[in-house]
Curated annotation (Swiss-Prot):
Protein name per Swiss-Prot or TrEMBL: Insulin-induced gene 2 protein
Alphabetically ordered keywords of this record: Cholesterol metabolism, Endoplasmic reticulum, Lipid metabolism, Lipid-binding, Membrane, Oxidation, Phosphoprotein, Steroid metabolism, Sterol metabolism, Thioester bond, Transmembrane, Transmembrane helix, Ubl conjugation
Gene: Insig2
UniProt lineage: Eukaryota, Metazoa, Chordata, Craniata, Vertebrata
Main location: endoplasmic reticulum
InterPro entries cross-referenced by the UniProt entry: INSIG_fam
Length: 225
């Protein structure tokens, strides 16, 4: 090599641990964003279903309802969906119980369809009393968990999410931040916990499936390296 010529410095390669940590953190952010937009979309769709029952804050006009004064509701639902979807696989790893029951996208899509169907039933089907209505929705929600989840952690998180979300919703209503147009507020309270439980199970399944896809991609990259 001639004098005066300097060897160009080679780019330093990151170690496998740093690369893995970086890719995992980026994937978590991506999963969170995907879950957020899924939650926003489902919140808008389910709100349009509930308009048929006239129990939401929004006026009957469909287009106006999406851009009503309660604009913060879909983003809040999206944020909650992201937290729930990231929490489920995290709890599975912490407990050392990876969820392997019906781990394919077709099952997840059926779970979403059943969840929307439960919401549609709460908006369309009339019952003689609120207790009968609550019992039916509870059976449907537990059936959704049994069909698409069957994990103890999933059931426990679903119950916790339903309780916490119901309490927060009632506090918002009592403080005048949010309100329902339905004259029968007992009717609204009869289906809220069941809908929140089913929603938690649904978003948990989506989050688990996204996490499993991430693990497959990372495993394939590690084998290639």
């Amino acid at each position: 090599m001639a004098e005066g010529e300097t060897e160009s410095p080679r780019p330093k390669k990151r170690g496998p641990y740093i690369s893995s940590v970086t890719s995992q953190s980026v994937n978590v952010v991506i999963r969170g964003v995907v879950l957020f937009f899924i939650g926003v979309f489902l919140a808008l769709v389910l709100n349009l279903l509930q308009i048929q029952r006239n129990v939401t804050l929004f006026p009957p006009d469909v287009i106006t309802s999406i851009f009503s004064s309660a604009w913060w509701v879909p983003p809040c639902c999206g944020t909650a969906s992201a937290v729930i979807g990231l929490l489920y696989p995290c709890i599975d790893r912490h407990l050392g119980e990876p969820h392997k029951f019906k781990r394919e996208w077709s099952s997840v899509m059926r779970c979403v369809a059943v969840f929307v169907g439960i919401n549609h039933a709460s908006a369309k089907v009339d019952f003689d009393n609120n207790f009968q209505f609550s019992l039916t929705l509870a059976a449907l929600s537990v059936g959704l968990w049994w069909t698409f989840d069957r994990s103890r952690s999933g059931f426990g998180l679903g119950v916790g999410i339903a309780f916490l979300a119901t309490v927060v919703t009632q506090l918002l209503v009592y403080n005048g931040v949010y309100q329902y147009t339905s004259p029968d507020f007992l009717y609204v309270r009869s289906w809220l916990p069941c809908i929140f439980f089913a929603g938690g199970i649904t978003m948990g399944n989506i989050g688990r499936q996204l996490a499993m896809y991430e693990c497959k991609v990372i495993a394939e990259k590690s084998h290639q390296e």
